[in-house]
Amino acid sequence: MHTVKLLCVVFSCLCAVAWASSNRQPCHSPPLTSGTMKVVSTGGHDLASGEFSYDSKANKFRFVEDTAHANKTSHMDVLVHFEEGVLYEIDSKNESCKKETLQFRKHLMEIPPDATHESEIYMGSPSITEQGLRVRVWNGKLPELHAHYSLSTTSCGCLPVSGSYYGDKKDLLFSFFGVETEVDDPQVFVPPAYCEAVAFEEAPDDHSFFDLFHD
């Protein structure tokens, strides 16, 4: 009888832990983050690698591709103001700019509010000092894009670790390295003066952050 009672108590506790985990609310990114972001296709093709900066309060994102990356004739430099729904493609060498509308504003720098907490796991070793990292795994759907995603963040601090996007058009894998909770130059979120007079180009309603990365 005591054994049965003990098993019931243990089972109840495990259920409570599982319920609490599945109902965990999405964490929020620090006000400012920066570091290196690499994007590859699930087929193993390198799509982009460079420095990112993110302002979570203003929901602004800048990504400047490493000019040494691959054998490309042009390299990505994009600024996205998600709240305003504006995407800038910047060519600082020629001082030219392309400005597009962005109707779909979800992205993997911020966990969507309707994301589901999947699990909390250790990467590496939990028992050896400085040899492990505890991360939380979140996932969800993007029905407007006929896609779904998964995003891993640090348990303490909500820093991005990795992400994946699976859609009808493409599958993408994101990795983040050397992430800091600061941005050296806040001006990276301000479009260059030569972008001001550029007219908007209307983009489809399903045009998204994920369309930036392609073969």
Curated annotation (Swiss-Prot):
Gene Ontology biological process terms, A to Z: cell-matrix adhesion
Residues bearing glycans: 71, 94
Q: One GO molecular-function annotation for this sequence?
A: calcium ion binding
Q: Where does the secretion signal sit in this chain?
A: 1-20
- Give the UniProt subcellular location, in the record's own words: Secreted
This protein's UniProt keywords: Calcium, Disulfide bond, Glycoprotein, Secreted, Signal
- PTM per UniProt? Binds calcium through the terminal sialic acids.
Primary location class: secreted
Q: Name one GO cellular component term.
A: lysosome
Q: Which InterPro entries match?
A: Ependymin, Ependymin_CS
Tissues where this protein is expressed: EPDs are synthesized in the meninx and secreted in the cerebrospinal fluid.
**Pfam families assigned:** Ependymin
* Family listed: Belongs to the ependymin family.
Query: Subunit details for this protein?
Result: Forms disulfide-linked dimers.
Protein name as catalogued: Ependymin
Which lineage do the record's taxonomy fields give for this organism? Eukaryota, Metazoa, Chordata, Craniata, Vertebrata
